[in-house]
Amino acid sequence: MAEAPQVVEIDPDFEPLPRPRSCTWPLPRPEFSQSNSATSSPAPSGGATANPDASAGLPPASAAAVSADFMSNLSLLEESEDFPQAPGSVAAAVAAAAAAATGGLCGDFQGLEAGCLHPAPPQPPPPGPLSQHPPVPPAAGPLAGQPRKSSSSRRNAWGNLSYADLITKAIESSAEKRLTLSQIYEWMVKSVPYFKDKGDSNSSAGWKNSIRHNLSLHSKFIRVQNEGTGKSSWWMLNPEGGKSGKSPRRRAASMDNNSKFAKSRGQAAKKKASLQSGQEGAGDSPGSQFSKWPASPGSHSNDDFDNWSTFRPRTSSNASTISGRFSPIMTEQDDLGDGDVHSLVYPPSASKMASTLPSLSEISNPENMENLLDNLNLLSSPTSLTVSTQSSPGSMMQQTPCYSFAPPSTSLNSPSPNYQKYTYGQSSMSPLSQMPMQTLQDNKSSYGGLNQFNCAQGLLKELLTSDSPPHNDIMSSVDPGVAQPNSRVLGQNVMLGPNSVMPAYGNQASHNKMMNPSSHTHPGHAQQTSVVNGRALPHTVNTMPHTSGMNRLTPVKTPLQVPLLHHMQMSALGGYSSVSSCSGYGRMGVLHQEKLPSDLDGMFIERLDCDMESIIRNDLMDGDALDFNFDNVLPNQSFPHGVKTTTHSWVSG
């Protein structure tokens, strides 16, 4: 080994080689081309065709013998390595192969690199001779292609047949063309070689589960109930054919793919849309969402009262009111026509309307108008009826009327035996001490015709003969239209009986006047002449005699304009006012049976037996257009009947 000293001399050129983590061979370094030994460097040397070191280390016969093995090894290494090829000689390549065949050690570097292995098959640098041997790469084809052929020749471990195909064969092989699940398992173990050794419980869990899945997921298999008790079902081939192979999974009826459910859901959606469209079309005003309220414009249709009683929107409840009030609130009715109907009062929320009430179409015809006059004529001699109502500025208030029956010998202000307690909000008031002012804001400039006076024949008689007053009262009014803009009106609506004229306000109640007084004196202050605080108040009343053949009630217009604090005016609510109720009793009202003063500031409000402060704070202040305060006008009041007052201000923020 005379070459050992020479190898030691060239060791400094191979300092980057000691890398035991990879032992990459060859290392593409330019220093390799300057080395004198071809065996020490696997890289091709500069270009010497005959290397004396190679001839000295290995005889030429052995080098020629190794060349064939080297070429076969190169064919295996072609696919895994793709290094740039450097030009070299055949002798250098043969010498490198010989060095690998001697033991895999770097024989030239035994002194330093004894532990560095160079396995020839995995890391060969394809030297230059590869380009001279084109038939070498096809040699790798059979080696690499054999596993691919074996894997592509079979779809499954037992062959090309799928589970569904095996199940089909099993069912067809039976005499009755049907098998139970356990019989299918037995056929698999007996007929398919792959499953012969997999019949036990431990090794059969996987493929048996696959068979169950294929039976349930393929449409070509159907399940038939077994006649015997305690026996599993039969599995048969679908006589209709079904789909061969895998079909889409058959899911249970769900919301997504069930056609019947989709159809029923579509029908339900159509019904819901039609109901919503019908409700939206019921009202022509911005308050159409409250079209089923008795006082809304949409409620004055031919719908019966029982429909109103059965449908009550959530927005009318106390828990979901708009501004915190306890009474439902309607939107402004500015876009109503001249003939549209205003609503003055809402029904009480705590009471339910009777379902046996007549419909509007039955009680609003002209024939019932004449019957109303006859009924009113019956009342003119024996009794007079006083109705006390209250309404908020935008006609947005629930009320329960107070009925007072007085004999002819007594005045209108005498105590009455029958009444119904007035309730509003949280204030509890005595009904006889509660005769508030009726206010209504209206910007109309023309009178609306008295097109409906809702009273059925004989209902007024029932009012007199009944032991207790009716439980509900819905009062609606035709558009008055005489109020000035930005003003509140005090209406005096007097409906005269047949052949009677409007007398002075101080007369007895022998005339058939049904009044809505804005102030009601204590029964102890009953006088022959109605006087507010002892004052005789001037008034202007336009009366017209009622003729026997007229079908419309004659109105009495009493426009009054009373200046009140901070330029707030209260002008008369003149025009026609037809009053109707759920019970069908027609009532007409005069807001003042007394003479009104020209200036209300001079009145002694202490003697008024109504809670004016509660009314102003709770009712009048709820209107959006009202912005005033009565603190400096209303002194400390003492009510003779102990009226419970509330200082809560329900003004919407």
Swiss-Prot record:
The modification Phosphoserine is found at S210, S216, S232, S233, S247, S254, S285, S296, S317, S320, S323, S327. It holds the Pfam family Forkhead. The record marks N156, Y163, R223 as: DNA-binding. GO terms for molecular function: chromatin binding; DNA-binding transcription activator activity, RNA polymerase II-specific; DNA-binding transcription factor activity; protein phosphatase 2A binding; RNA polymerase II cis-regulatory region sequence-specific DNA binding; sequence-specific DNA binding. GO terms for cellular component: cytoplasm; cytosol; mitochondrion; nucleoplasm; nucleus. Residues 281-561 are annotated as: Sufficient for interaction with NLK. Phosphorylation by NLK promotes nuclear export and inhibits the transcriptional activity. In response to growth factors, phosphorylation on Thr-24, Ser-254 and Ser-320 by PKB/AKT1 promotes nuclear export and inactivation of transactivational activity. Phosphorylation on Thr-24 is required for binding 14-3-3 proteins. Phosphorylation of Ser-254 decreases DNA-binding activity and promotes the phosphorylation of Thr-24 and Ser-317, permitting phosphorylation of Ser-320 and Ser-323, probably by CDK1, leading to nuclear exclusion and loss of function. Ubiquitinated by SKP2. Ubiquitination leads to proteasomal degradation. Ubiquitinated by STUB1/CHIP; when Ser-254 is phosphorylated. The modification N6-acetyllysine is found at K243, K246, K260, K263, K272, K421. Residues 307-324 have a biased composition (Polar residues). The modification Omega-N-methylarginine is found at R249, R251. The modification Phosphothreonine is found at T24, T331. Residues 209-216, 232-235 are annotated as: DNA-binding. A motif (Nuclear localization signal) lies at residues 249-251. Its main location: cytoplasm. InterPro entries: FH_FOXO1 (IPR047408), Fork_head_dom (IPR001766), FOXO-TAD (IPR032067), FOXO_KIX-bd (IPR032068), TF_fork_head_CS_2 (IPR030456), WH-like_DNA-bd_sf (IPR036388), WH_DNA-bd_sf (IPR036390). Interacts with LRPPRC. Interacts with RUNX2; the interaction inhibits RUNX2 transcriptional activity and mediates the IGF1/insulin-dependent BGLAP expression in osteoblasts Interacts with PPP2R1A; the interaction regulates the dephosphorylation of FOXO1 at Thr-24 and Ser-254 leading to its nuclear import. Interacts with NLK. Interacts with SIRT1; the interaction results in the deacetylation of FOXO1 leading to activation of FOXO1-mediated transcription of genes involved in DNA repair and stress resistance. Binds to CDK1. This is Forkhead box protein O1. It comes from Ictidomys tridecemlineatus (Thirteen-lined ground squirrel).
